[in-house]
Amino acid sequence: MQTYGNPDVTYGWWVGNSVVTNRAGRFIGSHVGHTGIICFATGASCLWELSRFDSSVPMGHQSSIYLSHLASLGIGFDEAGVWTGAGVATIAIFHLIFSMVYGGAGLAHSLFFDPDLNEGPIGRVDKFKLEWDNPNNLTFILGHHLIFLGVANIWFVEWARVHGIYDPALGEVRTIFPGYGDFGMVWGHQFDFIKIDSLEDVMSGHAFLAFLQISGGAFHIATRQIGEYTKFKGDGLLSAEAVLSWSLAGLFLMGVVAAFWAASNTTVYPTEWYGEPLEFKFGISPYWADTGDTSDCKYFFGHTSRAALVNVQYYFAFFCLQGHLWHALRALGFDFRRIAKAIGGLTESTSS
């Protein structure tokens, strides 16, 4: 974190990042604990939505964001192809169980394991020690992150190929065989990917991402800093604050893209599960508005699940952008206390 040259800076209890900034073991503990919170929220929310589900009202007009995602993945259908919520409770309970496992692992890493990863029962554990100004260390850790993301993409593609996902064009769950190596499709959808209307193209894109991420991960793990570590390459800038700002920038980008995609694409976000496509409007601030009849929407203040999902993602992305700018400027050395002092000076001169 930025200290502005003060080696003895202290942080308030609310600055949680300060506890894990230079403690790789605790950093892992916080990540695993956060995963546990996400798992618990997912399982609990899924059970809550299932308990309130009314089959006489379209799913997209209920408070059913989690059920909508499961239905899109082809989960919850009976043998006749009708969505009944079959197996959804089991998935939710598994999430609750795993949330306890993740929570216990997070506490173990925080309380019992080496907080700095200087030593451990597994060899080479010190390679994952956090050295924020060491490009070799950061690129090594980045490589592993990319490989895990690539594996997740493969898992999704194989799920669609083996189990199948919901195809709104047919109104049923079907298996999707991606075009492995179809780079022409990816190139052709660079600027109109939001309008994709083929699940084969969607899965091909994920297969391409898996290839790209795993290749990039292997490259980052195998390579080291090339040439002299100059200011152009990040010397003096590379820090925990800078990495945090880049992470927030990534969340901003993904949030905005997801918002625009979910608002208009009915292939990946079917109307049956999320409600009608949205319209982008301007008021006090930009927002997404429903375009269909919402008289039967009892939740989300009378809006569809699509409207709730998109607007929350859109505004979370906006605040991630503000966080990115804040931490990026701090990483560059800008002291925001100067603004408060300048305002205080103007106030004093005005009053005098």
Curated annotation (Swiss-Prot):
The keyword Transmembrane helix applies. One of its GO terms (molecular function) is chlorophyll binding. The keyword Transmembrane applies. It is found in: Cellular thylakoid membrane. InterPro entries: PS_antenna-like (IPR000932), PS_II_antenna-like_sf (IPR036001). The chain crosses the membrane at residues 27-47, 88-108, 140-160, 202-222, 242-262, 309-329. It holds the Pfam family PSII. Induction: Transcription decreases slightly upon iron starvation. Its cofactor is divinyl chlorophyll a; divinyl chlorophyll b. It comes from the Bacteria. Keywords: Chlorophyll, Chromophore, Membrane, Photosynthesis, Photosystem I, Photosystem II, Thylakoid, Transmembrane, Transmembrane helix. GO terms for biological process: photosynthetic electron transport chain. It is a multi-pass membrane protein. GO terms for cellular component: photosystem I; photosystem II; plasma membrane-derived thylakoid membrane. The antenna complex functions as a light receptor, it captures and delivers excitation energy to photosystems II and I. The Prochlorales pcb genes are not related to higher plant LHCs. Belongs to the PsbB/PsbC family. IsiA/Pcb subfamily. This low-light-adapted strain contains 8 pcb genes. The antenna complex consists of divinyl chlorophylls (a and b) and divinyl chlorophyll a/b binding proteins and binds more divinyl chlorophyll b than does the antenna complex from high-light-adapted Prochlorococcus. This is Divinyl chlorophyll a/b light-harvesting protein PcbH. It comes from Prochlorococcus marinus (strain SARG / CCMP1375 / SS120).
